[in-house]
Regions:
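Conserved catalytic cysteine-centered active-site region
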Residues: 63-71
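Conserved beta-strand positions in the central sheet of alpha/beta enzyme cores
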Residues: 33, 67, 99-101
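N-terminal beta1-alpha1-beta2 module of alpha/beta enzyme domains
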Residues: 1-62
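Glycine-rich, histidine-containing beta strand-loop boundary motifs that form or position
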Residues: 36, 70-72, 102-106
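Residues at helix-coil transition
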Residues: 61-64, 95
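Short, small-residue-enriched loops and turns at beta-alpha junctions
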Residues: 40-41, 75-77
Length: 140
């Protein structure tokens, strides 16, 4: 059985995320995930949410064995070509340890819809968002 750890980054400090990653690796966890969100829907203010890909790249430099990935990356937030390049780069930086979790993002009914609005993107219907995931997979 493989066991992974999810680090919830909402209002987290990098040094705490780093310590958790090192502890997870020392404890024998197989993988480590962090959310790829732009904001904490439950916080009106605070330090914000660390950007997932930047954190994962930094964690790749301090860990040696544990797999790393975003859980899950909303394909609407990045062009699939940019995402493919990001994934290839992180795969190289980690020495093959990238776990790529991708998804369609939340519907208009979720608090995460505000992330697309902040980027100037509309929150599309479920079937359109699902199709965009398939398109991103095909491109990658």
């Amino acid at each position: 059985m493989k066991t992974d750890l999810l680090i919830i980054p909402m209002s987290a400090r990098y040094r705490d995320m780093r310590a958790a990653a090192l502890a997870a690796e020392d404890a024998g966890f197989d993988g480590l995930w962090t959310w790829d969100h732009l904001r904490d829907p439950d916080a009106e203010s605070g330090p914000g949410v660390p950007e997932a890909w930047t954190v994962l790249t930094a964690l790749a430099e301090v860990t040696r064995r544990i797999a790393l990935g975003p859980l899950v990356l909303n394909v609407a937030n990045r062009h699939p070509g940019v995402l493919a390049n990001m994934a290839a780069t992180l795969q190289a930086v980690t020495g093959g340890r990238l776990l790529l979790g991708i998804g369609a993002g939340g519907s208009r009914r979720t608090p995460y819809a505000a992330e697309q609005q902040a980027l100037g993107l509309s929150v599309e219907r479920d079937e359109i968002r699902a199709r965009r995931v398939v398109e991103a997979i095909e491109l990658m």
